[in-house]
Swiss-Prot record:
<dbReference type="InterPro" id="IPR006595">
    <property type="entry name" value="CTLH_C"/>
</dbReference>
<keyword id="KW-0963">Cytoplasm</keyword>
<dbReference type="InterPro" id="IPR024964">
    <property type="entry name" value="CTLH/CRA"/>
</dbReference>
<feature type="domain" description="LisH">
    <location>
        <begin position="617"/>
        <end position="649"/>
    </location>
</feature>
<feature type="domain" description="CTLH">
    <location>
        <begin position="655"/>
        <end position="712"/>
    </location>
</feature>
<feature type="region of interest" description="Disordered">
    <location>
        <begin position="313"/>
        <end position="402"/>
    </location>
</feature>
<dbReference type="GO" id="GO:0007162">
    <property type="term" value="P:negative regulation of cell adhesion"/>
</dbReference>
<dbReference type="Pfam" id="PF10607">
    <property type="entry name" value="CTLH"/>
</dbReference>
<dbReference type="GO" id="GO:0005634">
    <property type="term" value="C:nucleus"/>
</dbReference>
<dbReference type="InterPro" id="IPR013144">
    <property type="entry name" value="CRA_dom"/>
</dbReference>
<dbReference type="GO" id="GO:0060250">
    <property type="term" value="P:germ-line stem-cell niche homeostasis"/>
</dbReference>
<dbReference type="GO" id="GO:0007299">
    <property type="term" value="P:follicle cell of egg chamber-cell adhesion"/>
</dbReference>
<feature type="compositionally biased region" description="Low complexity">
    <location>
        <begin position="41"/>
        <end position="52"/>
    </location>
</feature>
<feature type="region of interest" description="Disordered">
    <location>
        <begin position="271"/>
        <end position="296"/>
    </location>
</feature>
<protein>
    <recommendedName>
        <fullName>Ran-binding proteins 9/10 homolog</fullName>
    </recommendedName>
</protein>
<dbReference type="GO" id="GO:0005737">
    <property type="term" value="C:cytoplasm"/>
</dbReference>
<feature type="compositionally biased region" description="Low complexity">
    <location>
        <begin position="321"/>
        <end position="343"/>
    </location>
</feature>
């Protein structure tokens, strides 16, 4: 009895209300789920007593416990009768490896006779009998409690204390929820009141037995679904199957042990999820029924521990699989959290078990235990994705690279597309295509040779492949296996097997013969049947073809093949079915890449062995380098190189330096000075080439808007070098928004100290005065980067100038019409500039006036070329683009900002340099460029004539970089 006093006393609720339906169902569900992982003896609580006078249970040994994968042993007659007369649910439930069945107590014959006599004599239900026999049961419990306290004294006390505390906490949360939502959750009595009401209802209806009919029980309460704990436990492997835990004696309060501190909060999450995803997820329990069961501990236990995984549709699965990496990391970390972790989201739509593990429906497609040999799949977006062994993350398909482009890099598919599938338009009617037009099935009768049917690709094999290979897998040989794999010309008839007609070549599987444009076959290789992989390779260098079987080379089958051949496969008897692989998947024959490397080496050795007929390569290369340096006006470098190689100049050195100066002016944006030097040094060049002059003028107009050629306003001024700002404002906008400062300097001087922005990278264009102290347009400073227009005075530079207002590129875009429309728009802008009458504004206005005047002159020049029919479409577009820059307050960020890029000056300088050399009777291009262009053209000609070597030659091979 001392051991009984040490153990915590059983609650009055549990002792007096042993047959309460809520506690009984919760205890029964707990015994089914095996959440505690221990054996539950039927005599540990009066709510689980199935006989009036149970005997003390005998602890079962590890050998007596049944294996979790095998069913429980059949019950004897006494146990069957006791369960039929018991008010508790004994419907069959699935057994999992976490829980071992409770040991059954033997029932003697006198006890059975005594129980039958009591049932015949007494009319009250079994509940009253059990209440009357409770003192005897308490006496029988004492030895069992002594044993429990001896084995687990401290653990049992701590567990019961935690259980009682959690149970009262959950009951308080449930009452608080009912008070907040009186409409959604109807008021229900507390645990004590419901148990009292249960006894009163039983006493009021003594004639109605509470014994359930075993035939109706499965319909009234179906077996519970799989537990998340069970599935989570099965993931750990099969080594836990034989592990046995010591038996624990659990009373009615133990049902709260599987409910953690977040149980009620997670129950609320289930209801919130039902409201949010009602259209895309199916919930097993009705929401109204669930709300009515939340107030009971059994309902909370069922909702928390036994959760049916909903079936997600493909529409709802897609957005969840596209979560970012942060969500993936968060979901991965949640798998290692315990049951008290508060990092779980309330709005999650996944399911969490009692130990904090994260589950989703994708992880368990079928509720079958996974074997220990199954490897775990990675989680993506909180869901487990099952990968197939065939899919490799290192394959080109997963890296976003076309494998055919890697296999045939020299093929230009815009001109000669690669065969990638069978053509649905170039086939016989008896042929059926499926699986992206890669699977071929015969659908004819197949009685005669005329019943043969073939299919080919939509495009022929490009000769620029050099070496082309494809494979065909025999899915089924059909009735007779009359199949042919080969090559055909475009005019091949599709009711014949490849090889029977002219310009068709095939390898047949029924006899292993090769057919070359004839009905008479030649002995070639073995036959092939279901499961074999047949490959066909075409060599465009020597115009041969060979076949492979299951990765083994069978030797050359055909020679002297024509060009433009199509991959073809032919079938003849019912049931024949094949799959094609044109390079999308790895080949069975893995020596294609090595063969291509060997052929490439042979072609390069052939080029190196070609005899040099003219002179030694050293002298030829020296002349090529010298002419290239002279052509591009690298005067100092050319002079040093010719002195080292003992070569002479064909052009005067002074002419080379003049061209060099003009090229530098163009590259720095000083178009007006470049044009002036060209007219002075090479008279008659621009006058006789009006199109070139017009192109230079268009570029000059662009540089004026850019601010690099402001000296065009006055020919006596020069400008320093420019930089390319990222947010430059046009000269037009700067002059329109110019404001004169009212600073108290007295002399009207200005300060240009604020000439750079935060990036400190731009250098302003300074206009230097050439005479006179009066401020004029030549005394203007335009800061291209800081959007300031500053007046410069030769006496002092101390007075600050207000910065011009910065405008975004939100100006109205004007349509690029003809030249007259552009001139009218320029006139309108010119009239607008007359509004500002301040002296400084007039100076800035003169700048824009000069730009507009130059634009009118350029427009007139374009009209003159139009009259003489000398204007090309390229020059017409150039003029429209240049005039369109006026419409933007920030030309750099406009759609035409590429015109202001310094790289656009190179083409203008190259054109002018070539024109100058041509006027001096020199070549427009250096000889080195001619050689490179000639070699490129020869490679194209080789490909056009289907010689095959072009697949293994590039410009870098002919002219190596090192």
């Amino acid at each position: 009895m001392e051991n009984v006093e040490e153990a915590p006393p059983l609650s009055s609720e549990s002792n007096s209300n042993s047959n309460n339906s809520s506690a009984s169902s919760s205890s029964h569900q707990l015994s089914q789920s095996g959440a505690m992982g221990a054996e539950i003896a039927p005599s540990t609580s009066r709510s689980h007593s199935h006989s009036p006078t149970p005997s003390p249970p005998v602890p079962a040994s590890s050998h007596d416990q049944p294996h979790p994968d095998h069913p429980s042993p059949p019950l004897n007659a006494s146990e069957t009768e006791a369960r039929e007369n018991s008010p508790h649910d004994h419907s069959p439930t699935p057994t999992f490896h976490q829980t071992a069945p409770p040991p059954t107590t033997s029932s003697t014959a006198p006890q059975r006779d005594e129980r039958e006599q009591q049932q015949q004599q007494e009319a009250p239900p079994l509940q009253q009998d059990q209440q009357e026999n409770s003192p005897a049961q308490d006496q029988e419990l004492h030895p069992l409690l002594d044993q429990q306290n001896q084995e687990y004294p401290a653990v049992h006390q701590d567990q019961q204390a935690e259980q009682n505390q959690e149970l009262h906490h959950i009951e308080g949360l449930i009452r608080h929820r009912e008070s907040q939502n009186p409409e959604e959750h109807p008021p229900q009595a507390s645990l004590e009141n419901r148990e009292t009401l249960g006894r009163e209802d039983t006493n009021q209806e003594p004639d109605e037995p509470q014994v359930r009919d075993p035939e109706i029980e499965p319909e009234a309460e179906p077996p519970p679904p799989l537990l998340l704990e069970d599935l989570d436990e099965q993931d750990s492997g099969s080594q836990d199957l034989n592990e046995q835990q010591p038996p624990l004696i659990i009373d009615a309060n133990a049902i709260a042990e599987t409910i953690d501190a977040n149980a009620v909060e997670r129950i609320d999450d289930y209801e919130d999820d039902d409201e949010e995803v009602d259209e895309e997820e199916e919930v097993v329990e009705d929401r109204v029924d669930r709300a009515g069961e939340v107030a009971s501990v059994s309902g909370a236990q069922r909702l928390h521990s036994v959760a049916v995984l909903p079936r997600y549709s493909s529409a709802s699965r897609a957005p969840r699989s596209s979560n970012n990496n942060n969500n993936n990391i968060s979901n991965h970390n949640n798998n290692n959290n315990n049951s008290n972790s508060n990092s779980l989201s309330r709005r999650t739509r996944h399911f969490y078990s009692n130990n904090g593990s994260h589950f989703s429906n994708d992880m368990f497609p079928s509720h079958n235990p996974r074997s220990s040999t199954q490897t775990s799949s990675p989680r993506v977006g909180g869901r487990r994705h099952h990968s197939t062994p065939a899919a490799s993350s290192n394959s080109p398909q997963h890296q976003g690279v076309d494998p055919l482009r890697l296999l045939y890099p020299n093929v230009n598919e815009s001109e000669t597309p690669l065969p990638r599938c069978w053509s649905p338009h170039d086939k016989c009617l008896s042929i059926g295509l499926s699986q992206n037009n890669l699977r071929v099935t015969y659908k004819g009768v197949g009685k005669q040779h005329s019943d043969a049917a073939s299919v080919r690709t939509a495009y022929p094999i490009p000769s620029s492949c050099g070496l082309y290979y494809f494979e065909v897998r025999i899915i089924s040989k059909g009735r007779n296996g009359y199949m042919g794999i080969g090559l055909t010309a475009q005019q091949f008839r599709m009711n014949r097997l490849p090889g029977w007609d002219k310009q068709s070549y095939g390898y047949h599987g029924d006899d292993g013969n090769s057919f070359s444009s004839s009905g008479n076959g030649q002995t070639y290789g073995p036959t092939f049947t279901t499961g074999d992989v047949i490959g066909c390779c075409v060599n465009f260098v020597n115009n041969t073809c060979f076949y492979t079987k299951n990765g083994v080379d069978l030797g050359i089958a055909f020679r002297d093949l024509p060009t433009k051949l199509y991959p073809t496969v032919g079938l003849q008897t019912p049931g024949e079915e094949v799959d094609a692989n044109f390079g999308q998947e790895p080949f069975k024959f893995d020596k294609i890449v090595d063969m291509m490397k060997e052929m490439r080496s042979n072609v390069l050795r052939k080029i190196d062995r070609y005899p040099h007929l003219l002179e030694t390569p050293e002298n030829l290369m020296n002349r090529l380098v010298s002419t290239y340096l002279v052509h591009n006006a690298f005067s100092k470098t050319a002079e040093a190189f010719n002195g080292y190689t003992n070569q002479t100049f064909n052009e005067d050195l002074a002419s080379i330096k003049t061209r060099q100066k003009i090229i530098k002016l163009i590259l720095t944006g000083k178009m007006s000075q470049a044009i002036e030097h060209t007219l002075r040094s090479f008279p008659g060049l621009l006058e006789n080439n009006k199109n070139l002059w017009f192109a230079l003028k268009c570029r000059q107009f662009i540089e004026m808007i850019n601010g690099a050629d402001i000296e065009n306003v006055n020919n006596k001024v020069t400008a320093t070098t420019q930089t390319m700002p990222t947010n430059q404002t046009s000269v037009i906008q700067s002059t329109k928004t110019f404001k004169h400062s009212k600073s108290g300097s007295g002399n009207g001087n200005v300060n240009i100290n604020q000439t750079q922005q935060q990036n400190n990278t731009a250098i302003p264009a300074v206009i230097k005065p050439q005479g006179g102290d009066r401020p004029d347009i030549k005394n203007m400073l335009v800061d291209d980067n800081s959007n300031k227009c500053v007046e410069h005075d030769s006496n002092s530079m101390d007075v600050e100038m207000e910065p011009c207002q910065s405008h975004s590129n939100g100006g109205d875009s004007s349509s690029n019409g003809n030249a007259s429309a552009v001139r009218n728009s320029l006139d309108a802008i010119d009239e607008e500039m007359d509004v500002d009458v301040s002296p400084s504004s007039r100076n800035c206005g003169r700048v824009i006036e000069k730009i507009l005047e130059f634009g009118k002159e350029l427009s007139s020049m374009g009209q003159q070329l139009e009259k003489e029919n000398l204007m090309t479409e390229e020059e017409r577009q150039m003029l429209e683009d240049a005039f369109s820059l006026i419409a933007y307050s920030n030309p750099w960020s406009s759609p035409l900002g590429w015109l202001l890029c310094p790289s656009r000056r190179e083409s203008v300088s190259t054109t002018l340099n070539s024109a100058i050399l041509e006027s001096l009777n020199f070549e427009r291009r250096p000889p080195l460029e001619y050689l490179v262009a000639h070699a490129s053209e020869l490679i194209k000609v080789i490909g056009q004539h289907s010689l095959g070597e072009d697949a293994f030659i590039t410009i870098d091979d002919v002219f190596p970089q090192n």
